[in-house]
């Protein structure tokens, strides 16, 4: 799947990105390269291959799951500008 300039402009608009007209050919080319790589990876036959979370069979040494900090929720909420029912109230930031 190859992207055209109009596709990149639409994606940029949906993502609220401001792109220069001079940058569009480079960005279109870069996105097409990425999509080409994805197409190559999807073309590989992976039937019978078990998915890996990590290429090496190693176990991680994890620390004990122990509480290390005290609950300061009440103290933090007492200095917050606005709290309701135990939740912090913040101004709307997305249109």
UniProtKB/Swiss-Prot annotation:
GO terms for molecular function: asparaginyl-tRNA synthase (glutamine-hydrolyzing) activity; ATP binding; glutaminyl-tRNA synthase (glutamine-hydrolyzing) activity. InterPro entries: Asp/Glu-ADT_sf_sub_c, GatC. SUPFAM superfamilies: Glu-tRNAGln amidotransferase C subunit (SSF141000). Keywords: ATP-binding, Ligase, Nucleotide-binding, Protein biosynthesis. Allows the formation of correctly charged Asn-tRNA(Asn) or Gln-tRNA(Gln) through the transamidation of misacylated Asp-tRNA(Asn) or Glu-tRNA(Gln) in organisms which lack either or both of asparaginyl-tRNA or glutaminyl-tRNA synthetases. The reaction takes place in the presence of glutamine and ATP through an activated phospho-Asp-tRNA(Asn) or phospho-Glu-tRNA(Gln). Heterotrimer of A, B and C subunits. This is Aspartyl/glutamyl-tRNA(Asn/Gln) amidotransferase subunit C. It comes from Pseudomonas fluorescens (strain Pf0-1). The gene is gatC.
């Amino acid at each position: 799947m190859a992207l055209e300039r109009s596709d990149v402009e639409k994606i940029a608009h949906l993502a609220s990105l401001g792109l220069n007209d001079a940058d569009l050919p480079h960005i279109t080319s870069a996105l097409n390269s990425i999509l080409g790589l994805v197409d190559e990876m999807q073309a590989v036959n992976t039937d019978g291959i078990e998915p890996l979370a990590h290429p090496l069979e190693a176990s991680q040494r994890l620390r004990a799951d122990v509480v290390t900090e005290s609950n300061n929720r009440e103290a933090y909420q007492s200095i917050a500008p606005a709290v309701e029912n135990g939740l912090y109230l913040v101004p709307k930031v997305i249109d």
